[in-house]
Amino acid sequence: TDAQFKVKHTFDRKNELAILGLGAIDDMKLNTGMEDMSEKNQYILAYLPVVKQKTYTLGAVYKHYSGKNIYSLIVSRSQLNNKNIKYKDNDESSEENLTLNYRSDEIENKLRSENIFRFPFFRLNVGGNLEYATYTNRTYQKQFTTIPRVINYHTDLGLLKWGLYATAIYESDNERFTASLGVRADANDYSPEMNNLLDQLSPRLSLSYRLFGAVYLNGSIGRYYELPPYTVLGFKDNQGNYLNKANHLTYIRSDQAGLGLEYRPSSYLKFSAEGFYKKYDQYPMSLVDSIPLASKGTDYG
């Protein structure tokens, strides 16, 4: 089930407010009463948990117009709630049959302020953001291995994040050449390795040049930083300590470069062919098999 809404109000020629929201509910059920109970279907039903997911985002955007310049203030709140439940033989008649009960919540509250200044052939965007996020995880799981064991895990995490950014965009008089130069810096209060904006400084440059007609040559290069997943940030050891904080976890870094051709036959249609190079560094890895977490699939045990 999905739902969304948007309400926009114009106070006067210089001020407007938009409020919007969207949400989704996924409520999965196992079809244990199917007629074709083949061996394959029995296997799938035996390990697949019941998944329930709820997510929503609510936000408001205030804009003030001053000549060619625009000031924006954006506030939003989003939540992702996940539940995975599994009973042995899908028999819910007794709690003794419960083999998995996973519940997690990710909540983000965001505030962003942005100014857009317009000049002849030139535009400047500057802004900053402040966010507070919470993450909780409650997991009960019975593992039937060589030595059966019960996992009873819980964690809570609160994280304050902040950032600054600026982008300058130039466009020639005949619109033949366009250049964009930007920089962004992010930090948070998770650990000393993450609370300095200069340690996560992200410069980026993109260029576009019209070779002839509607054919353009595009190129870009930049460095980007990404916060590790909340599951990694909030992971605790048996003593209740954030394990990856002690491991000096840092932002994930990605250096990227791209080059390509673009054909724009009209204002609403374009064709492009591009090549990219990406190099990742400081990516979290699994200690069990030394595989980056991005390459590991989901295993319901």
Regions from the PLM with identified roles:
Residues 5-9, 60-64, 111-117, 164-170, ...:
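Residues on the lipid-exposed face of transmembrane beta-strands in outer-membrane beta-barrel proteins
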Residues 14-17, 68-71, 81, 121-124, ...:
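Repeated loop/turn-to-beta-strand initiation elements of outer-membrane beta-barrel proteins
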Residues 19-25, 73-79, 126-132, 181-187, ...:
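Transmembrane beta-barrel strands of outer-membrane/channel proteins
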Residues 25, 31-38, 74-98, 136-143, 158-192, 209, ...:
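Surface-exposed extracellular loop regions of Gram-negative outer-membrane beta-barrel proteins
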Residues 50-54, 64, 99-178:
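Outer-membrane beta-barrel transmembrane domain signature of Gram-negative proteins
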Residues 104, 108-114, 152-165, 246, ...:
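Outer membrane beta-barrel strand-and-loop segments of large Gram-negative receptors
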